[in-house]
Curated annotation (Swiss-Prot):
Keywords: ATP-binding, Cytoplasm, Kinase, Nucleotide-binding, Transferase. It is found in: Cytoplasm. HAMAP family: Guanylate_kinase (MF_00328). NCBIfam families: guanyl_kin. The keyword Transmembrane helix does not apply. This is Guanylate kinase. Its EC number is 2.7.4.8. It comes from Coxiella burnetii (strain RSA 493 / Nine Mile phase I).
């Protein structure tokens, strides 16, 4: 069985994480993105089972008690959680898994899976982040300022991550993510299992 990788991508609200992740998954083969469960309401364009699994507070808390989540966190008074069984099944089958979660969840995952590789997406500036939140047209000015304050708190945890990617130029940011994941897949301990037959043939004495 091939060794599977667990990747984490986190970012403050408005940094473009979701768009980057979608482009990354489209560009890279053999990587599965975990779909989180959430109690937040659907937004226009959200698809059940594609963007999130939308559940109510009662069901979410029941899943917490059942130990169904690998990690869970509260963001803007809404709950988000990563289903444990699905992730473990993918890893056991040798498939790379990508988690799109916040820094709280990333911390929990690293405690459970120390080899997990984590990437934090940064905006090019606070003003750029503010402009992106305004262009969403989802919140009023007061809420946007609250989100910016929380974003500063989130970005203060950047040192907990392995890589930092600034989303200034979208295409370049996608390429940076591809390079990071490709390099991780080429590490010796990963390649050693994938290339076991070739390596045996190359080094075996005749």
């Amino acid at each position: 069985m091939n060794k599977a990788n667990l990747f984490i991508i986190s970012a403050p609200s408005g940094a473009g994480k979701t768009s980057l992740v979608r482009a990354l998954v489209k560009a890279l083969a053999e990587i599965k993105i975990s779909i989180s469960h959430t109690t937040r309401p659907k937004r226009p364009g959200d698809q059940e089972g594609v963007d999130y699994f939308f559940i109510d507070e009662t069901r979410f808390q029941a899943m917490v008690k059942e130990g169904a989540f690998l990690e869970h966190a509260t963001i803007y008074e809404r709950h988000y959680g990563t289903e444990k069984d699905w992730v473990l099944r993918q890893l056991k089958a040798g498939r790379d898994v990508l988690l799109e979660i916040d820094w709280q969840g990333a911390r929990q995952i690293r405690e459970l899976f120390p080899p997990a590789l984590s990437i934090f997406i940064l905006p090019p500036s606070i003003e750029a982040l503010r402009e992106r939140l305004i262009k969403r047209r989802q919140d009023d000015t007061a809420i946007i300022e609250q989100r910016l304050a929380l974003a500063r708190e989130e970005m203060a945890h950047y040192k907990e991550f392995d890589y930092l990617v600034v989303n200034d130029n979208f295409d370049q940011a996608v390429q940076n993510l591809i390079h990071i994941i490709s390099a991780e897949r080429l590490q010796r301990d990963v390649q050693e299992k994938k290339l076991s037959r070739l390596l045996a043939e190359l080094v075996e004495k005749q």
